[in-house]
């Protein structure tokens, strides 16, 4: 391992040992925020190679009131730039996943070599992500999605722009916790049918700025606990606004 990897792994191991109780007790569902996760150099390298808006790597998600953003369409590891690839490999390593298991209590985590739904995300001015619970299943691997990890890459950020990650209660009545997407901030949280999250208010950053992140998902072969299941079958995201329309 390189120096930055050793440093980040030591930090994760210490956090997993000291903060498991904090993670599990967090409201509205288990989560943890880790600031200054990577070395300044490697976090800066990630930002420096972040694709431009017009890069062909981007897949456009433009669903009014649901999600308006850019998402990387990684077909293979050859599409991933060097610093990003090194961080992705590190976060998907056995040593890191053992730390995540120690922190969360979710054993035998599996990374996603297909990067389904994960990778780089970029939200421009007026972009949004409606409050939702994530899809629960990986079709290609036949495994259950259990954990989300987000690393933010916003060197310049003003909270007045909006764009904070909102964690909502399971009845979808209110935002309980709001987390600003600050540079080199890592967020780890459980994902299941009741872990509603998003940034539903259109982003008001200047036209030359954006909300940047790296997102990875982790899975288990064994099913999630029954009390985390609303929909038994494999499903994609459960969007708040779509559910409200169905109930209207």
Describe the residue ranges of each PLM region:
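Non-heme Fe(II)/2-oxoglutarate
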Residues: 4, 11, 20-103
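A structural signal for short, well-ordered beta-strand segments and their strand-loop junctions
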Residues: 33, 59, 110-113, 119, ...
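Histidine-centered active-site/metal-ligand motif
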Residues: 31, 132, 197-199
């Amino acid at each position: 391992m390189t120096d930055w990897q050793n440093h980040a792994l030591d930090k994760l191991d210490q956090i997993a040992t000291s903060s498991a109780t904090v993670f599990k007790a967090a409201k509205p569902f288990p989560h943890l925020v880790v600031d200054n996760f990577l070395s300044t150099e490697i976090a800066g390298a990630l930002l420096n190679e972040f694709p431009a808006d017009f890069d062909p790597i981007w897949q456009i998600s433009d669903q009014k009131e649901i999600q308006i953003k850019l998402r990387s369409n990684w077909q293979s590891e050859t599409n991933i730039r060097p610093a990003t690839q090194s961080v992705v490999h590190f976060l998907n390593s056995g040593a890191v996943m053992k730390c995540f298991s120690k922190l969360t209590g979710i054993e035998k985590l599996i990374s996603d070599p297909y990067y389904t739904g994960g990778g780089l995300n970029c939200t421009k001015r007026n972009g949004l992500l409606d409050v939702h619970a994530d899809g629960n299943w990986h079709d290609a691997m036949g495994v259950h999605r259990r954990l989300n990890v987000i690393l933010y890459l916003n060197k310049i950020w003003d909270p007045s722009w909006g764009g904070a990650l909102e964690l909502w209660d399971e009845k979808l009545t209110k935002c309980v916790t709001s987390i600003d997407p600050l540079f080199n901030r890592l967020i780890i949280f459980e994902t299941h049918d009741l872990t509603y999250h998003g940034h539903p208010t259109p982003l008001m950053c200047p036209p030359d700025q954006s909300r940047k992140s790296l997102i990875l998902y982790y899975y288990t072969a064994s099913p999630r606990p029954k009390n985390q299941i609303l929909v038994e079958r494999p499903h994609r995201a459960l969007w708040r606004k779509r559910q409200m329309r169905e109930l209207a």
